[in-house]
């Protein structure tokens, strides 16, 4: 029996007391962790445990959790488990740092390689990668110096300045360069809205009207598996807060999504485990927005569509075993950001 350790950064205490962390990150982390644990522990040949901050132990089944404070060393944990599945936000190098430390102890860490994590974490570098390979993606600029609409513009000392030309055409989407989920995102209509922002941390992307979709791609030694795409539900107040999603999507949307992700995969190194891709299917153009180098909330809906068997299949695929892609239900399944699923 394979013993699997799942470490979710917010819930484990690696980030300190979860009560002091952004609520959206803790909620998303807990949602993914519970769904993943449930899926893995339904497999007879797998056993999964997680590490929890003492303040969260009452919210998890006692048989699934190790309550350890302070967080033990990776070498100590590696002696009791065959595989580590880490989940963490990319922001401030948290995911990459966690993975690099854990690789020193664990022989198998179910996460993309460090170079791919670094590429996907930095949204500006992701943009340059996509452009270099001829993949459609919104124009993306660092706020401290960008060009658009024939002009050159800068944010200096928190003040927006037109260096040359006229004010660039909007609207844009403001994002943290290394943000996780919709952290810090908002719609920008006028350049003056950029005033007061900390330089070097933020980017602007041209706002593309259309339908937000995501697709999970599962890496393993025999090649990638493409999960059914999901519609993403975002708030309409300009903050783009993630509210959940649904699957399956229309056959036309599915073909368009698959066309983009297949092209993307050809530009990436091989990887293990989950890779999420966010896209916009527009009236005029379909674009890739971001790459997520770790588990995303859409796992909740996709695992339900797979009858609860998705996580064990990901493990077997990563180990190069005689794994079979799960069958996903054709019945509509909705899910929210808290992990609740709905079916007709």
Task: List each language-model region with its residue ranges.
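Conserved N-proximal alpha/beta basic substrate-recognition cap immediately N-terminal to
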Residues: 39, 49-147, 164
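Extreme N-terminal starter segment of soluble prokaryotic enzymes
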Residues: 1-5
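Peripheral (often C-terminal) accessory segments that flank ATP-dependent C-N-forming ligase machineries
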Residues: 83, 282, 313-344
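ATP-dependent carboxylate/phosphate-activation module, predominantly the ATP-grasp catalytic core
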Residues: 205-269, 281, 292-319
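Active-site nucleotide/adenylate-binding loops and adjacent lid/helix of ATP-dependent enzymes
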Residues: 116-211, 219-227, 244-263
